Each structure stands twice: as C-alpha cells, then as structure tokens.
From Swiss-Prot:
Membrane topology: Peripheral membrane protein
ABC transporter domain segment(s): 4-234
Name this protein carries in UniProt: sn-glycerol-3-phosphate import ATP-binding protein UgpC
Lineage: Bacteria, Pseudomonadati, Pseudomonadota, Alphaproteobacteria, Rhodobacterales
Keyword list, A-Z: ATP-binding, Cell inner membrane, Cell membrane, Membrane, Nucleotide-binding, Sugar transport, Translocase, Transport
Similarity remark: Belongs to the ABC transporter superfamily. sn-glycerol-3-phosphate importer (TC 3.A.1.1.3) family.
Quaternary structure note: The complex is composed of two ATP-binding proteins (UgpC), two transmembrane proteins (UgpA and UgpE) and a solute-binding protein (UgpB).
Cellular location(s): Cell inner membrane
Superkingdom per UniProt: Bacteria
Functional summary from the UniProt entry: Part of the ABC transporter complex UgpBAEC involved in sn-glycerol-3-phosphate (G3P) import. Responsible for energy coupling to the transport system.
EC assignment: 7.6.2.10
Amino acid sequence: MAEISLRDVRKSYAGIEVIHGVDFEIADGEFVVIVGPSGCGKSTLLRMVAGLEEITAGEIAIGGRVVNRLEPRERDIAMVFQNYALYPHMTVRENMAYGLRIAKLSKAEIEERVARSATMLELGQLLDRKPRQLSGGQRQRVAMGRALVRNPAAFLLDEPLSNLDAKLRVQMRLQIKELQRTVRTTSIYVTHDQVEAMTLADRLVVMNAGVAEQIATPAEIYDRPATTFVAGFIGSPAMNMLPARGLGDALEVAGQRLAVPAPAGRDLILGVRPEHLHAAGPEEPGFELHVQAVEWLGADAFAHGRLADGTELVLRTPGKAPVRERDRLKVAPDAAALHLFDAETGRRL
C-alpha cells in the first residue's frame, strides 16, 4: 500500500490545456473516487497516474516516489477497466495468474495468491471456466481478481461497472466496498455515476472541465457544496437553484422576502434540495408552485413545476400522498438547509 500525491498536475493537447493544475493527496489505504460528467478529464487524470498518458506539467508520486518518467509496469499499480480485458482463450485461473507468471513468481506463490483472491471474490467454482462462459458480473470479478493477486501499491479502476445492468451494479458496488474494507489498498476509482461515487468513496474529487471543483467526503460535498456545479451535479434530482438578491438582513427570491442574511445589493443564487422544501403555513413566507409533472417512485414522489417568475422547482413528497399535476402549492425552504452562492462566480458564500 502507498500514499499517492498529485501536485499541480496539468495536461495539454496541441497547446490546449485540458487538465488545469490538479492538487490532492491520497492517504495510504484511502479509497478516492473521481467523479464528473463526460469530458471533464477524470479518465485522463487516472491515465496520467497509471503512466498511460504523459504529464505536461506537475508531479505525481506513489509511495513517496516521483513516477513522472516511470513506465506503467514500474509504478506498482494494478488497473481494472470497464471492458474487463480478459484473455478469451485462457481460463479464469490462467487469466488471474498471467501477470504473476510474467513476473516469474514461483508456482506455489501463484497458486496461493490465486486461491486467496478467488475465495475473496467468490470465484472458486469458476476457476476452470473461460470468459465466454461467464456473466458480465463474473467477468468483472475476474478482472478485479487479476488486479488483486498482484498485491499492488494501488488500484486504479476506470468505470469498472458501466457495462453492467442496474442489479449487477448494486451487487458489484457492495462487493467492491467489502473488498476495500478487507484489503485496505490505496485506490482511485473513476465514474460518472454519482451513486457509485457517494456510496464507495472515503473522499470525492468532483471534476468539471479539467478542474477539481471540490475534494471532500461525500457527506461534506452533499451538505456543503463548494460551487453551483457541485451542488447541481451531486444529488438526484439536482439541487434547486433560484436567482436571488441580497438585502442585508434578508434575501429576495421570486418576489418573496426570506429572513436570510445576505450581502446587500449582491446578485446571488439560493440553493435548496428537493427534500428541504415543505408545504408552507398560512402566515409563512413561501413560493407558489404550479405543478407540471409528478414522478412517482413508490416511497417518494418528485413534483416538477414552476414558480410565478418561471423558475423551475422540484419538490420531494411522500409517495403515499403525492401531489397531482396542475396542483398549485405554497412551498417554503427549510431555513437550516439553505445554500447561498455568488451568482457571478458560482462559489459558495
């Protein structure tokens, strides 16, 4: 196991910078998830750690050793890809053992490592099968086993669950979490799926257009997003964003005055999550929501609508008492769960 350091890491293609000075430290045994939309630079960043992409500027260290100029095989890392990358003519056992054979480990050591990893990943009954005889989830477990037997300093996982169906993704998510709890190997996991990110990570790195917008625990990112981008990306449905103006001792939002201190004369954005809106009392300041669509999900329902000024709003309600389309509701935000952002920079106040 080893700590991993990224120090002002940059990447350019044809003079155009696509990764903009990323800095973070990963502790020994920590599981860090890099999450963001397509094209944000998360896989490029992972490939630079792996040595599959050259670094334009900055420094990457694994276990205290700068690896900028080292080949991938010299970095003591193991990668798991979304397409499994198994040898079709080899059995599960042979696929898992292949890297160890190349490294010229003894036959006894190879057998012991393969057996231990197969037990951990529940592959014991599949060792003599070939990839074509396996399900997608089983193939991904073999790919993980092939990485695990190497006892690397770090695991790098690039969207390993994206080819699986929803049920298998849940099963594999739980298995990866249990595996990390057992082996405690330093890991970097890349995904665009916020559920994977929130449930697996010790810490998240939220990427946007080559910039690490926020690096924090899942709870901190959900409860205190640093920017409007993070607030809108993490959480489903996304956080409601309402244009607002500071009045000093209050906030003007959609024609209503809320008792929320805010810098006078400043254009702001009020963020409120769908679960932090409630039906307003007769004397309580609130917004009239014209419901246009309702998504019923069983335990919960999400009412989508617009305020009088056209601002879109989503409200979460109990599934047993959902609102109906074309309803008009007076709703108010929970005062203890509001988020204020600067309208120009998008940064949290």
